[in-house]
UniProtKB/Swiss-Prot annotation:
Pfam families according to UniProt: GCS2
InterPro entries linked to this entry: GCL_type2/YbdK_subfam, GCS2, Gln_synth/guanido_kin_cat_dom, YbdK
Species of the source: Rubrobacter xylanophilus (strain DSM 9941 / JCM 11954 / NBRC 16129 / PRD-1)
Catalytic activity, reaction form: L-cysteine + L-glutamate + ATP = gamma-L-glutamyl-L-cysteine + ADP + phosphate + H(+)
Family designation: Belongs to the glutamate--cysteine ligase type 2 family. YbdK subfamily.
One GO biological process term: modified amino acid biosynthetic process
Classification lineage: Bacteria, Bacillati, Actinomycetota, Rubrobacteria, Rubrobacterales
Parts forming coiled coils: none
Name by which UniProt lists this protein: Putative glutamate--cysteine ligase 2-3
Top-level EC class: ligase
Keywords noted in UniProt: ATP-binding, Ligase, Nucleotide-binding
SUPFAM superfamilies associated with the record: Glutamine synthetase/guanido kinase
PANTHER family assigned: GLUTAMATE--CYSTEINE LIGASE 2-RELATED
Enzyme Commission code: 6.3.2.2
Amino acid sequence: METRFGASPPYTVGVEEEFQLIDPRTRALTPKIEEVLAAGDGELPEGTLASELSASCLEVRTPAYASVAELARALPALRARVRRLAERSGARLVSAGAHPFSPAAEQPITGKPRYRKVDEEMGWPARMQAIYGLHVHVAVPGGEEAVRAVSALARHVPLFIALSANSPFWEGRDTRLASVRAKVFGLIPRSGLPPRFASWEEFVRHVERLVRAGSIRDYTFCWWDVRPHPKLGTVELRAPDAQTDPGRTAALAALCQCLAAAAEEFEPEDPLLTEENKWRATRHGLEAELYDFSGQRTVAARRAAEELVGRLLPVARELGCEAELEGVLEISRSATGADRQRAVLAREGSLKSVVDYLAEATA
């Protein structure tokens, strides 16, 4: 394994947003990825648009920004440009963790050799991955800092899931989960919470063992909720559902950036204990009661978000993302994306109406 850690300016931030491509007539997923990529050729900087496993998914990558404030200003305009490209290709753009009714297994796999190989190796779990996430990259100075940042972010994965929960429906049914995406993603190997690494060297050894065993080709086949990304010189948070509102994307990016910068303030937590809170957040979203294992107390997810923001505000001021971090408070005091989708269904009585709402709200 390449053991050098990429050099990016510390604590710069970028995101990858995975969008659903929707048939305007049926409101079902449509495998239009190749058409959208062709439409975007020359229209956007190289590398901005990418395919994922499902041909009904469009990944949009931002550049690295010096501050989350810059990211927040850029996101709406970027989304607008991508939406126009999708419309020229005969698709609508939706940002949410899962489609309300399209069968996952009916979505074609993209033609990339990497994803064809994944499909061949995994079978059914790969065919279930019609899910859409938000990935946040934060640059850190080196490998040891990356391991500490991964640890700090991992213990807060349940809170990220609660705040971002935006996938209540699966194949036409209400799952009674706030984030069905979190459970579907768990079907694939090397997903979920990362192992607890004591050092960069331990992470490298872990990956090298998996490579020698023939399980993976490189570290990018470790699809944990948060992982080091040596090539980019970042830590990558992968747990959140895709966000309909770009303001929420920016708020979650600010929380991620602050935790990465303040990683030394947070003790590592046993992943088996964090897993319990992850389940509670997956099931109940911001209505979850999370257990603080170090403080031996139960705390409501909304309260946990407020306490964490308060703790991180001095860091946010240094990073210039105070306003965006306070956006986490706005999320914690309002309905989740999952709640809003359910409210549309209750009001309109149709999952197609939920898709229409999501398409209109994906600003």
